[in-house]
Amino acid sequence: NQHLAYDDLDLDLKSELSEKKAIHSNIGVLMLSGGDLKDAKRVEHPIFREHPETGKKALYVTEAFVKEIKDLDPKESQKKLEFLYSHASQEKYIYRHKWSKGDLIVWDNRSVQHFAEHGYGDNERTMHRLTTSGSKPY
């Protein structure tokens, strides 16, 4: 729950990073999937984003895509990102699902980071992904 992760951040850090942008890139995904690296893109998104329906702020950095914090010294950027990644992945912000036959999970990508832990053992699994359009994280 990245809303709670944001809420628990120190006020000074929130203030320091409130207007900062993170540079996101899909190059890691392309490398893993054998995609054409010419298709790599870099985009800027705020480190803290506001949910368009609830107005709640959330931490919006993920180790898989964020490469740096714009306008920060590279070492300082890396130090801050490592802290934010560690903070965001604390157990208290994690939901682990125990799979049962017929389960359906829906989540809001604007508020979470998700990661498959393969908790279904040797059981057959059928997965359907539905992606709806949404707002940019600004």
Residue ranges and their predicted role:
Residues 1-104, 109-138:
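Non-heme Fe(II) oxygenase catalytic core, chiefly the N-lobe of the double-stranded beta-helix
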